[in-house]
Amino acid sequence: MQILLANPRGFCAGVDRAISIVERAIEMYGAPIYVRHEVVHNRYVVDSLRERGAIFIEDIAEVPDGSILIFSAHGVSQAVRAEARARELTMLFDATCPLVTKVHMEVARASRKGKEAILIGHAGHPEVEGTMGQYNNPKGGMYLVESPDDVWKLNVKDENNLCFMTQTTLSVDDTSAVIDALHRRFPKIIGPRKDDICYATTNRQEAVRNLANDADVVLVVGSKNSSNSNRLAELAQRMGKPAYLIDSAADIQESWLQNAKCIGVTAGASAPDILVQQVIARLQALGAVGSVELRGREESIVFEVPKELRVEVKQVD
């Protein structure tokens, strides 16, 4: 039994930046540091930061005056941002992924111009809630769609004054189908110059396509609430391969590997490499011999942390 590793996999630049912001804030200012929502959707990361002194909250009212607050990588609405600024906080840091901020700016621009905006995304996801919350023009409208069926059921005020944008962590294939439906339903709708689905999501889905071509079973390291990790498992399943989303090596069931000659392993954009290494070790303990990393797209994007946090911090294992 051989192990095939998808490439690229694991942390993206936005996740790396968000985690660094929390780590550096703890290092510079000391615990506790308050974070609105899980900074990224990974149980291992959140538990590790909690052990170091991060306190994850959903309501800013839970944050005591004089505290330091960080927004998660998923972004927040204008209302949440205004609420935080009205509080007597010592410091406020924004760990929103810059690629999510780009979508926020598209929505805010549409709101200012009075255009109606349609967001392709998953209801209830914090990124979607934050993005929808950038629109505040009562004369226009902001709508959420998840599928082509939603598009055909949608009622807007002015079909000639529409634009759309997307959540950054969607299935490339599913989103393409929704965009096609939007163009058929609303021929004059305007979209972003470049797809809002981020480079990391696109690259990891492409890597899973390559992986699933050769693997008998695919293991995706990522938490259940991670949108991009779920999309990786779904993609492998659509390609006809058994695929399992796992938080850690402890989740692996031997029955999944029966008769498998090649096990594919990848990781969502919020899953650290240590979890992948533990999965490899577990598979080797179950009889896998060696691992091979597939060729894939090189990623060199780096997002800077806020200037107030640009100091050397201790390396944490």
From Swiss-Prot:
Q: Which family does it belong to?
A: Belongs to the IspH family.
- Binding of isopentenyl diphosphate, residues: H41, H74, H125, S226, S227, N228, S270
Report the cofactor remark.
Binds 1 [4Fe-4S] cluster per subunit.
Q: Which GO terms describe its molecular function?
A: 4 iron, 4 sulfur cluster binding; 4-hydroxy-3-methylbut-2-enyl diphosphate reductase activity; metal ion binding
Could you name the active-site residues?
A: E127
Q: Which reaction does it catalyse?
A: isopentenyl diphosphate + 2 oxidized [2Fe-2S]-[ferredoxin] + H2O = (2E)-4-hydroxy-3-methylbut-2-enyl diphosphate + 2 reduced [2Fe-2S]-[ferredoxin] + 2 H(+); dimethylallyl diphosphate + 2 oxidized [2Fe-2S]-[ferredoxin] + H2O = (2E)-4-hydroxy-3-methylbut-2-enyl diphosphate + 2 reduced [2Fe-2S]-[ferredoxin] + 2 H(+)
Q: Which GO terms describe its biological process?
A: dimethylallyl diphosphate biosynthetic process; isopentenyl diphosphate biosynthetic process, methylerythritol 4-phosphate pathway; terpenoid biosynthetic process
Residues the entry annotates as binding (2E)-4-hydroxy-3-methylbut-2-enyl diphosphate: H41, H74, H125, T168, S226, S227, N228, S270
Q: Does the keyword Oxidoreductase apply?
A: yes
State the oligomer form and interacting partners: Homodimer.
Keywords (alphabetical) are: 4Fe-4S, Iron, Iron-sulfur, Isoprene biosynthesis, Metal-binding, Oxidoreductase
Instruction: Please give the pathway this protein is involved in.
Output: Isoprenoid biosynthesis; dimethylallyl diphosphate biosynthesis; dimethylallyl diphosphate from (2E)-4-hydroxy-3-methylbutenyl diphosphate: step 1/1; Isoprenoid biosynthesis; isopentenyl diphosphate biosynthesis via DXP pathway; isopentenyl diphosphate from 1-deoxy-D-xylulose 5-phosphate: step 6/6
Which residues of the sequence carry a binding annotation for [4Fe-4S] cluster?
C12, C97, C198
The UniProt annotation places dimethylallyl diphosphate binding at: H41, H74, H125, S226, S227, N228, S270
Q: Which residues, by range, are in coiled-coil regions?
A: none
Q: Which residues cross the membrane?
A: none
This chain belongs to the protein called 4-hydroxy-3-methylbut-2-enyl diphosphate reductase
Function according to Swiss-Prot or TrEMBL: Catalyzes the conversion of 1-hydroxy-2-methyl-2-(E)-butenyl 4-diphosphate (HMBPP) into a mixture of isopentenyl diphosphate (IPP) and dimethylallyl diphosphate (DMAPP). Acts in the terminal step of the DOXP/MEP pathway for isoprenoid precursor biosynthesis.
Q: Which cofactor does it need?
A: [4Fe-4S] cluster
Q: Per the UniProt record, which EC number(s) apply here?
A: 1.17.7.4
**Stored InterPro entries:** LytB/IspH (IPR003451)
Q: Endoplasmic reticulum: present as a keyword of the record?
A: no
Q: Taxonomically, which superkingdom?
A: Bacteria
